[in-house]
């Protein structure tokens, strides 16, 4: 479940914020913070209260909440750039550089995730037209934070094949993709598990495809050829590549993700996105064009996916946007598909109700029973906030997988 970071009230709704107490941990930390500029203070006051409420609702202990809010202030707040944002990030519909989400799995503590694309005052300027200077500065900062198991070597291996070189950047002269205002090349995701932080990287090769004239699949193969453990994906990668090309699923929205850990242990994720997607196409995507129809794991996952689709899209066979990824594990025999139901701009109460029904369906009854009240508190901390009047909290909802993620 993904939640927005800044509220935008629907047309006709009151824009007056209800009176409510700020989260205690957030308030205590804020008193001791010394911001370098007004932008940092604004990013903190507009985003940190929501993160604080999400951490609390997900069952994080008070020390953990303090730890991760402090990390948020140290690592991300100084690297969101000017406020209001000038650099348009690809990670959110609105172009904001940050997004919060919660991952629920049976038998496990919920995991809060922070997706962000670093930005700065030079992002998009002649000094950093495609934001890579800023991204690399933040990568170096994460290296100095000594996250357990953090290893940026795979980032450095793949970046030259999937992102613009200095010469290519100069050649494009700040140009964007056709029909888009986004120029993102890299972004990060942080999984907050227990007391630990796991870093994920996302690379967006569309601009590299534009300037090189090479297809996404060609760039990906060239990048993985430099990966010392590329043979670990030798069985499963051809399945994904052949379907994505056959199904005409590679486009300017395609990107890749991987874990910033020892490269022999890192997952590889290949993302696709299509506009105006039907349930029939979702089935095709899930089974890689019938390549996995005999897989029991794939069949079980598709049944979950159909249930989620029905709860979030009752009576409809099409949605405006479809986003998915194929997760490739080292040495795996088949990819694990994950599909994200894009709920941007839809009624918050109907979305929350659909998710609640799905959680009941998969046996997360306790989580389901308290979910709507928790979501209501996300908006300014009001327990009974009228979600039927808002369309701001949800972006994407992914399916529960038949097995737990590693």
UniProtKB/Swiss-Prot annotation:
rRNA-binding listed as a keyword: no
Record site: Required for regioselectivity: 115
InterPro entries: Aro_prenylTrfase (IPR033964), Aro_prenylTrfase_DMATS (IPR017795), DMATS-type_fun (IPR012148)
Record: residues binding dimethylallyl diphosphate: 113, 200, 202, 269, 271, 340
Compositional bias (Polar residues): 1-19
GO molecular function: prenyltransferase activity
Pathway listed: Alkaloid biosynthesis
Entry annotated with the keyword Transferase: yes
Binding site for brevianamide F: 99, 204
A biological process term (GO) from this entry: alkaloid metabolic process
E.C. designation(s): 2.5.1.-
Keywords (A to Z) from UniProt: Alkaloid metabolism, Prenyltransferase, Transferase
Pfam families: Trp_DMAT (PF11991)
Region (Disordered) location: 1-23
Family: Belongs to the tryptophan dimethylallyltransferase family.
Role, per record: Prenyltransferase; part of the gene cluster that mediates the biosynthesis of paraherquamide, a fungal indole alkaloid that belongs to a family of natural products containing a characteristic bicyclo[2.2.2]diazaoctane core. The first steps in the biosynthesis of paraherquamide is the production of the beta-methyl-proline precursor from L-isoleucine. They require oxidation of a terminally hydroxylated L-isoleucine to the corresponding aldehyde by enzymes which have still to be identified.
Name of the protein this chain belongs to: Prenyltransferase phqJ
Organism: Penicillium fellutanum
Underlying gene: phqJ
